[in-house]
Curated annotation (Swiss-Prot):
Keywords: Ribonucleoprotein, Ribosomal protein, RNA-binding, rRNA-binding, tRNA-binding. Belongs to the universal ribosomal protein uS7 family. The lineage of its organism: Bacteria, Bacillati, Bacillota, Bacillota incertae sedis, Caldicellulosiruptorales. GO terms for biological process: translation. It holds the Pfam family Ribosomal_S7. This is Small ribosomal subunit protein uS7. The keyword tRNA processing does not apply. It comes from Caldicellulosiruptor saccharolyticus (strain ATCC 43494 / DSM 8903 / Tp8T 6331).
Amino acid sequence: MPRKGPVKKREILPDPVYNDKVVAKLINKVMYDGKKSIAQKIVYGAFDIVREKTGKDPLEVLEAALNNVMPVLEVRPRRVGGATYQIPIEVSPDRRLSLGIRWLVEYARERKDKRTMKEKLAAEIMDAANNTGGAVKKKEDTHRMAEANRAFAHYRW
C-alpha cells in the first residue's frame, strides 16, 4: 500500500488515426510482445472491414458493441464464517470498459470461422453490436451469476 496518497492513474494517449482513447486501449489489448504497429494494422484493418460490411462509422459500431458487452454487475468471492460466498457487486466504469475490451479481443482470438485476426476482430465487433457472439454471452453469464447470488448482496463491503 502506498503511503503518499492514492496512486495516480496513467493517462493513455489517443490513437493517431481516430484520435480516440477507447481505440488506443483496444490496440494495446490486441498487442503482443510490444509490437504496437502490428496491433494497429490489425485494429485499423478490422475497422475497414466493419465499414465495408455495415456501411457505418466503425467507431459507432465499436461503441454499440462495447455497450452490449460491458457488464454492470459481477461476483466477487468473500469469506464469511468459514464459507466463501460469491457476492454480486457493481462494476466501476473504468473496469466495465477494460472488461468489455478484454472480452471482445479474447473471443475474437478464439473464433475459428475466419483466417486472419483482423477478420476475427471485425466479426466479433459486428456480432457484439448485434447482441450476439461470445463476448455478449460472457456478459450474460456474468449477470446470471450475479442474479443467482443476489441473496448474498447484503454481505457487500
